[in-house]
């Protein structure tokens, strides 16, 4: 949260920040923007949340905690500063367990927008996509950052804030070492999403309790 505030303050001269971790998304009152690593995103109705929660809880019982090693900061293509973690089989196992349990409940539905606010229908309708692997994963999972047998697109990261002016790039050199974010991922959670991929409305969290392989 401190790093999010540091970056958001630094964006004040270039349009400001869309959100700060630990605070509600501006204009919403459904909870603070929680620091998180996105494992999966899906579209469901409010009446189906309990079913999804039960699926995620079941997945958590099948996999072990993850040693999360933060390795670098960098901007995403929309200028949002993010801290990235080393890809690992432990991370992949957790993501695959969650998707195996929850994705069938998607029932083919596609989210309206990606975290940057871009319509996903346009990505799927493009006859000449720039990123065919992304399109394939969106059609298969409704999510395009998946580690599967064809493409390893899962790149664990935390989005620290998001610039209002997406052409700007805040300086990342004053930040604490990325390694300071390293730790142990012991729980998965289910959240409702706000703009820019933020997690605001909390539905539950579950400890990873599976036996080591």
What is the role of each PLM region?
Residues 1-69, 73-76, 88-187, 195-213:
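Basic, often amphipathic N-terminal segments
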């Amino acid at each position: 949260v401190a790093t999010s505030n540091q970056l958001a303050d630094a964006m004040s001269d270039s349009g400001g920040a869309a959100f700060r971790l630990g605070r509600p998304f501006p204009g919403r009152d459904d909870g603070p923007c929680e620091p998180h690593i996105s494992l999966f995103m899906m579209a469901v109705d409010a009446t189906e949340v309990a079913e999804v929660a039960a699926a995620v809880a079941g997945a958590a019982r099948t996999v072990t905690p993850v040693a999360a090693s933060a390795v670098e900061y960098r901007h995403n293509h929309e200028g949002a500063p993010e801290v990235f973690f080393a890809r690992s089989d432990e991370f992949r196992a957790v993501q695959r367990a969650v998707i195996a349990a929850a994705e069938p409940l998607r029932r083919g539905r596609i989210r309206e927008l990606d975290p940057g606010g871009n319509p996903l229908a346009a990505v799927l309708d493009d006859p000449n996509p720039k990123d065919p692997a992304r399109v394939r994963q969106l059609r298969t999972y409704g999510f395009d950052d998946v580690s599967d047998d064809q493409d390893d697109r899962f790149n664990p990261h935390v989005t620290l804030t998001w610039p209002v002016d997406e052409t700007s790039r805040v300086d990342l050199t004053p930040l604490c070492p990325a390694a300071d974010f390293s730790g142990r991922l012991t729980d998965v959670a289910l959240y409702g999403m706000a703009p820019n991929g933020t997690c605001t409305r909390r539905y539950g969290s579950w400890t990873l309790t599976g036996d080591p392989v």
